[in-house]
Amino acid sequence: MTERKAAAPRGPYGAWFCLLVALALEVVRVSSNHDTLDPIYLPVALELLDAPEHFRVQQVGHYPPANSSLASRSETFLLMQPWPRAQPLLRASYPPFATQQVVPPRVTEPHRRPVPWDVRAVSVEAAVTPAEPYARVLFHLKGQDWPPGPGSLPCARLHATHPAGTAHRACRFQPSLGACVVELQFPSHWFSQSATTRAELAYTLEPAGEGPGGCGLGTEEEPREQALPVGGVELHPEDPPQYQEVPLDEAVTLRAPDVPMRPGQLFTATLLLRHNFTASLLTLRIKVKKGLQVIAARPAQPTLWTAKLDRFKGSKHHTSLITCHRAGPAGPDSSPLELSEFLWVDFAVENSTGGGVAVTRPVTWQLEYPGQAPEAEKDKMVWEILVSERDIRALIPLAKAEELVNTAPLTGVPQRIPVRLVTVDSGGALEEVTEHIGCESANTQVLQVSEACDAVFVAGQESRGAKGVRVDFWWRRLRASLKLTVWAPLLPLRIELTDTTLEQIRGWRVPGSAEGQLEPETAAEEVERRSRGCRLQYQRAGVRFLVPFAAHPLDGGRRLTHLLGPDWLLDVSHLVAAHAHVQDPRIASLEGGRILVGREPGVTSIEVRSPLSDAILGEQALAVTDDKVSVLDLRVQPVMGISLSLSRGMSHPGEVTATCWAQSALPAPKQEVALSLWLSFSDHTLAPAELYDRNDLGLSVSAEEPSAVLPAEEQGAQLGVVVSGVGAEGLPLHVALHPPEPCRRGRHRVPLASGTAWLGLPPLPTPVPALPSSPVRTSPFTEATVEGKRQIAGDMGGHVGIRGKFERAEEEAGKEENEAKEEEEDEEEMVPAPQRVTDLELGMYALLGIFCLAILIFLVNGVVFVLRYQRKEPPDSATDPASPQPHNWVWLGTNQEELSRQLDRCSSSGPPKGEGGCPCESGAGGDASTVAPSASESPAGSSSTLARKEAGGRRKRVEFVTFAPAPPTQPPEEPVGAPAVQSILVAGEEDIRWVCEDMGLKDPEELRNYMERIRGSS
């Protein structure tokens, strides 16, 4: 039992040991995953010019792209309006170098051929007949406005391909609408006498020429393979009827043409009569407004009916009364319900129709029978005739774009697409419609339309996007639809930080605010004040605001269509930077919406709030800690020029990818070189020097040859030098990073880090045996070191100091001695930035720490065990005279025979009456020295045995055994059946009173006899 108790405390420590081992393995795994540093790229500025609406895009988790390096950078742009008025340019700049290129034309389906214009082609007719053998196609230029002159607009040539041959015709875009119509007549031999055939339409764009209409004559050869498709047109053998039938009553039906009428045109309306009509007299009253008149009424069957026309002119209406009499009975073989023509009414349209605008002319028809009221309203029917000077064939809406990116929820600024309605006439004439227009959006949760029907827009309240959302337009009896694609942002925003934990940079202090301080009187006080005004420098991080855009299905499904793809995000930093802020500006601040600056330790977040409401569009937590990191090295890339390459993407017509890289040609004499700097920190993060304020960067450059380099003009955060000449082996430039000049005191005069850049090709490395304890990494671009007390000339705030690396003047040597003394007097010594710890070293350190902790836990467990059981010794022998103190042992038992025997002894030998009471009650009546000897008088061991009756009738026996230092003079004789216990009662009478009372011995004589028996047995 003792062994189990001792082993029990080891259980929790074993569990903790297993947990720590698992934690060590996890540390090794995480360190292996953290092997690669943050991605690095050439911090060249890329911007699009003359592109009003564009976005930077990136793939999820791929910024910068994989092909970026210290000497190159790639960026992808999305142009939502790829054909602006001016040709868009992409400019790349890294002072003092800059270059630009024209964005290549858009690549269109299906042949992936670049075209310079975004053209929408709409086929007006779906079918043609020999009576109207004309196929009309409207071409419209989308995108931004174009120059007002017609010289820059191209021609569109329509090609028709039929099994019987080909035909083509061209039109030139007009500057007013940016549209034109091609009316192509099909040859008569293309039409079949019995079957319907099909002709395929396609178009090509060509520069304007000197032919009719400004376009070339073209050739009769087959259309080129690069032609873009328009659609197909069916060629019917005969002209289908175009009329409508309206019943005037149960027996008479009106059949009228369903086409617009032109001024001066004649047309005929026909009345049909059922064969079961039995009346012999029929009167037809026709009322027309001015501009339309009835000129004749002719019976279709003169042998059955006669017709008489009477005309009456009024101030507003002209009334014509036609009286029809039956001349003979109907044929016996005709069906009773069959309709047959019985009256033809001829109409004429007057020449004046109101300036060429289409108008409607109402015609009221009323049938009268004998015995019927002449003005019965129930028999009146109004039929409207559309009259126009133009032969209008279609109503077509023209939109600047067919795709809209809804950024209104992010900016609060509505997005609009202008829309213009035009009519297409026979002959190819176009005319804009501006009045009496109706419009309606089929889904207001996606897209809305203005009251004037001149634009579609999104205002920020829309909840979703969609592809092919429809907007309906109507004018008079003509209707048209416009389908667009709306991309909506999928909130919340993704706020991407290059580093979410900003730490204090060891040894780097920058000037702080000195407000409220008095001007110093001497130069020494100025230096002291400036040194006291320096504050800690924390890391900085770049910020990007990203969001995916998607279109929802119109049928209410959940499958989304993403812009560019599900793994592409749009950079909306230029849109939401004004609405972004740090929740606690004391901890960090956001400079320009793009750079996060740490201020003091704490935890906060970056929030972007909606400009339309108080809702949070996106949030990202960040922390600023007082943990210190070191600048391990500087990664330096010399830039002697930049090159740019542009390419079109395949995911979207407006996708453009720009790749820029630094030129590494050998520098010519007086060649200006810019140095791109990246700071590598001990927390495995990288940051370009452009993130930091140029006044906080103390940079210096040194060369082996004093006259090799000269300082260049300031170019912002970049470091520039002028190279006077270089040998064939290349020229190394050593760049060092210092704190600003006002904060260089003592240890802060030592460079924080340094790096080496090779101009041209670096020399071949000399094989040198490397020490095992100091591995050296080489790179073709940088050779980074952390310098100790190397003397490098430099100025504050990005100014460049140039000196020879091995040039040492006497005054400089004295200055070095003075600076060394100042550093010795400084309390804090500059700690060189440690080299980067490898993953193997991290794992070994973690395992070593785990083993040390396990050994410590084992030692603590042993000490606790010893302290807990050092006083618990096994019982010594009763004859051991060396035992310094007694040991009390308790024995629990239920020996019923022993308890009964003791009770019988007490009851059989009671004390005589009149004797004294229980000896435990007083000291009289007994020999005190015999009953309770003291420890000094009786060194023998003593014991007492007590028995008490339990509630259930079962007695327990409790033995108290005391081992004395010396054994008794005589061993006791134990009764048969009783436990062999050597016991002597050593307590006083007052101490054992409870024993007497519990055994039922009330009489003093009985108690005295019981005590004597106990002494005798002992």
Swiss-Prot record:
Residues 906-922, 932-944 have a biased composition (Low complexity). Residues 868-1018 are cytoplasmic. Keywords: Endoplasmic reticulum, Glycoprotein, Golgi apparatus, Membrane, Signal, Transmembrane, Transmembrane helix. Residues 666-1018 are annotated as: Confers cellular localization similar to full-length form. Belongs to the TMEM132 family. Residues 819-830 have a biased composition (Acidic residues). GO terms for biological process: negative regulation of protein catabolic process; positive regulation of Wnt protein secretion; positive regulation of Wnt signaling pathway. Its main location: Golgi. The chain crosses the membrane at residues 847-867. It comes from Mus musculus. Residues 1-32 form the signal peptide. It is a single-pass type I membrane protein. This is Transmembrane protein 132A. It is found in: Golgi apparatus membrane; Endoplasmic reticulum membrane. InterPro entries: Ig_TMEM132_2nd, Ig_TMEM132_5th, Ig_TMEM132_6th, TMEM132, TMEM132_3rd, TMEM132_C, TMEM132_M, TMEM132_N. Residues 606-911 are annotated as: Binds to HSPA5/GRP78. One of its GO terms (molecular function) is protein homodimerization activity. It comes from the Eukaryota. Glycans are attached at residue 276. May play a role in embryonic and postnatal development of the brain. Increased resistance to cell death induced by serum starvation in cultured cells. Regulates cAMP-induced GFAP gene expression via STAT3 phosphorylation.
